[in-house]
Swiss-Prot record:
It comes from the Eukaryota. It is found in: Membrane. NCBIfam families: A_thal_Cys_rich (TIGR01571). Expressed in roots, coleoptiles, leaves and stalks. Its main location: membrane. It is a multi-pass membrane protein. The chain crosses the membrane at residues 53-73, 80-100. InterPro entries: PLAC_motif_containing (IPR006461). It comes from Zea mays. Belongs to the cornifelin family. This is Cell number regulator 9.
């Protein structure tokens, strides 16, 4: 029923043979990707129709969307309220809120291993701020975060998922 074990005279020592993968499966419910995951954006810059509620929120109150993004990207060091307030003050008094938000796009790209768009992050935010913020928000959701809940709840969910899915013990059967 099971294939025979490789012969002891194998060219590779047992320590060099395939080792079990240790960690949390990314597809498990409630798991949050912790390390950088290199790849593409999960949605396009102009895919606002993918989430109409988010699109409306971002068009009418971009400070809320930005605050939620900033809290996740900063891993709780900056609260949604503080980031949103700074964004609003910059928008009202200088009109340069896009400079502040593009720095978070750059940081998010670096954390998640995402490629830069055909133009730099600041150009994306300057030309279409609502689209850029919506894309960032959708990406965080696609990566397992829920920006609506804030960093603390997302971190608790990740810790609970880690506790529920312990890594396999050494010495278990390997196929």
């Amino acid at each position: 029923m099971y294939p025979a074990k490789p012969a002891a005279s194998s060219s590779q020592p047992a320590a060099e043979m395939a080792q079990p993968v240790v960690g949390i499966p990314i597809s498990s419910p409630g798991a949050v990707a912790v390390g950088p995951v290199v790849g593409k954006w999960s949605s396009g810059l102009c895919a606002c129709s993918d989430d109409c509620g988010l699109c409306c929120l971002t068009c009418w109150c971009p400070c809320i969307t930005f605050g939620r993004i900033a809290e996740i990207v900063d891993r709780g060091a900056t609260s949604c309220g503080v980031a949103g307030t700074i964004y609003t003050l910059l928008a009202c008094f200088t009109g340069c809120h896009w400079i502040y938000s593009c720095t978070y796009r750059s940081r998010m790209r670096a954390q998640l291993g995402l490629p830069e768009a055909c133009c730099c992050d600041c150009c994306v935010h300057f030309c279409c701020e609502p689209c850029a913020l919506s894309q960032q928000y959708r990406e965080l959701k696609a990566r397992g975060f829920d920006p609506d809940l804030g960093w603390d709840v997302n971190a608790q969910k990740a810790a609970a998922a880690a506790a529920m899915y312990p890594p396999p013990a050494e010495g278990m059967m390997i196929r």
